[in-house]
From Swiss-Prot:
Reaction(s) this enzyme catalyzes, per UniProt: N(tele)-phospho-L-histidyl/L-threonyl-[pyruvate, phosphate dikinase] + ADP = N(tele)-phospho-L-histidyl/O-phospho-L-threonyl-[pyruvate, phosphate dikinase] + AMP + H(+); N(tele)-phospho-L-histidyl/O-phospho-L-threonyl-[pyruvate, phosphate dikinase] + phosphate + H(+) = N(tele)-phospho-L-histidyl/L-threonyl-[pyruvate, phosphate dikinase] + diphosphate
NCBIfam families per UniProt: PRK05339.1
Membership in a protein family: Belongs to the pyruvate, phosphate/water dikinase regulatory protein family. PDRP subfamily.
Main enzyme class: transferase
Entry keyword set: Kinase, Nucleotide-binding, Serine/threonine-protein kinase, Transferase
Originating species: Rhizobium etli (strain CIAT 652)
Enzyme Commission code(s) on record: 2.7.11.32, 2.7.4.27
Residues holding ADP: G153, I154, S155, R156, T157, S158, K159, T160
Stored Pfam families: Kinase-PPPase
InterPro entries the UniProt entry points to: Kinase-pyrophosphorylase, PPDK_reg
Purpose: Bifunctional serine/threonine kinase and phosphorylase involved in the regulation of the pyruvate, phosphate dikinase (PPDK) by catalyzing its phosphorylation/dephosphorylation.
Protein name per the record: Putative pyruvate, phosphate dikinase regulatory protein
Amino acid sequence: MENRTNFFHLHLISDSTGETLISAGRAASAQFRSAQPIEHVYPLIRNRKQLLPVLQAIDDAPGIVLYTIVDRELASLIDERCTEMGVASVNVLEPVMNAFQIYLGAPSRRRVGAQHVMNAGYFARIEALNFTMDHDDGQMPDDYNDADVVIIGISRTSKTPTSIYLANRGIKTANIPIVYGVPLPEGLLVATKPLIVCLIATTDRISQVRENRILGATQGFDREHYTDRAAISEELKYARSLCARHNWPLIDVTRRSIEETAAAIVALRPKLR
């Protein structure tokens, strides 16, 4: 009998780097061995304009929402929209801050990123996060030579969460989807500075994750083709051929956590440490 992993969507919304949320989400999900989260990380969300696309993404792929947003208006908007969608939302810091306020008899400052020391390392991480968000999913292809790392791979190989994890360590990371039969952007092919690495996984793993990705999605997917194992095998074959042609390294993420994948990438170029 096939031992299938159940996947669920875990949305992590932060007005800072997102490290607190990522740690909390992984600590909680580790207690449920039968289910594995598909992480969607949204750092540096500080106004309504930035938040609205995030809420749409949650509506497209419902799951659990954890957030650390100190702005009360934005936090209320998250809760209201999640209630409308029938999605559980948890303000991770609010119970802790309330306990502090009661004990100390003083209100919190509600200052974004207050836990971070404003040193050069912090600003480098913020710069890397901004770069990574601007260059997610093939955006701004003319800037790839400004990246430290460019991650490529077919859909559902953990490109975005790995990019965010690296950015939280000050590594400017872009990611580009490999689409079967579609040439890669010229900006990538002429880039000389970044480490270019391709993420792959087994056909079964990708099919399972894609099946869970389209749960609740009402449009935008050719469902049968998107999860078809034969089609996925062809996509992987195409990705491997591109990497062989350009001598780009491959990392299999099937049994790797995001942290392990990031460590494997950094190991390919020690100066990133």
